[in-house]
Amino acid sequence: MASASLQFFAFILALFGVFGDITATLLPNWKVNADVGSNIITAITQMQGLWMDCTWYSTGMFSCTLKYSVLSLPVYIQAARTTMVLSCILSAFGICITAVGMKCTKLGGDTDSKSHACFAGGVCFILAGVFGLVPTSWYTREIIANFLDQTIPESSKHEPGGAVYTGFISAGFLLIAGVIFCTSCFNKQPGAGVYPPPQHHFPSTEQESNAGYDLKDYV
């Protein structure tokens, strides 16, 4: 019962991780312009994401421009696009597989089949968490490196946006859920299956008794 409750808790974490992963992939605020120097008095907030660049004005207007050219993008943005999409796909597969393999559901067949399905879903969550953690870390590193570069003007410096933090938290949720599923699927009772129950066979005694019975019949 405790294992089923733990799996349900991991499933809720995985759901939050999936929704956060998809949200972080689509949000345009992976990095925002830094409020340093002359940028403090500006009335424009510039945001850059994986798929579009957006500008928010103090008047309330909002405009976005899609990034149509893939080859013109920096390498870390191309890698972030690929890994975040893979993370979303793997986490969605993990949700479907663990829903079948969880102990609190009536799907998936016998106990062994449900355990293997649950373990496969946990592996999907772990891979999704890794694929979500790599681009957010790389993207953050590039932002910090450009911010500390003295040759870059202050108007071109940026800070990590909300999408990066959402990606970090979602990757953590997926990793925790994957570890819980992988460790809770194959819990067995102590001593079960290790030492088979002793079996006593007395073939010689049975044969002697049968032989004696047969001789008495012929007397």
Regions found by a protein language model. Name each.
Residues 1-34, 38-48, 104-112, 153-165, ...:
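Intrinsically disordered terminal tails
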Residues 6-16, 79-93, 117-131, 163-173:
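Physicochemical signature of membrane-embedded alpha-helices that form the seven-helix bundle of GPCRs
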Residues 12, 25, 53, 82, ...:
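Alpha-helical recognition domains of nuclear gene-regulatory proteins
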Residues 23-27, 98, 130-142:
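C-terminal TM-helix exit segments that contain a strictly Trp-centered aromatic cap at the helix terminus
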Residues 27-81:
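A surface-exposed beta-alpha-beta supersecondary segment
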Residues 58-71, 131-141, 170-183, 211-219:
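Juxtamembrane/interfacial segments around transmembrane helices
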Residues 63-109:
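Amphipathic alpha-helical interface segments within eukaryotic helical scaffold
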Residues 117, 132-165:
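Juxtamembrane loop segments immediately following a transmembrane helix
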